[in-house]
């Protein structure tokens, strides 16, 4: 039977320092692939080292919107160099806009978002998008970059059905994480029901956003199964069908050959 693909897990996070190897061994007994996105140059370098250790772990490098205030030309050049010289780096990310915390101001966030989307296109890589309370500007900026090379993933989707459909038209996949499983996530469940399965990905965003029944605990890639089960329930499909299609979708967008 096909095993799930967790498209977004921060394996380098310090919360895994004490037992990372055990977590990865347990995860790869139940999952086929994991992608580890980065937040800044330091985590990008950690991701590079991690993907060397696990054959089915792939990575992404980039500057998170929280880190945009620390971004420089040299940092971006270093990230580009990491992506160019490591075949297991399959995307630029996670990048985007966060208007909830505002660790960086809007103008700075947007500047580095633009720069990294352009970088991804130059390198013919997909982008992994972080969008918190910034749906309008995220869609606007992506539309400004629209061409045949623009593609990617809207990670941990939290927007409306209309936003999801606009992103799909732009060549993006919609990725659902633990919040889809929360009983109160009525609008998210509607989005998952209405958009086609061939445009859906699943993720954990480990160690964050742990789904029921493990709320309050550290999240791990093993919990991606709960997201798959929720999509199956919402769409009236088998869990096997959801795992098969989301896995195929992830292999396609990340251009991973089996």
What spans do the regions from the language model cover?
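Mid-domain alpha/beta scaffold segments of enzyme catalytic cores
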Residues: 1-258
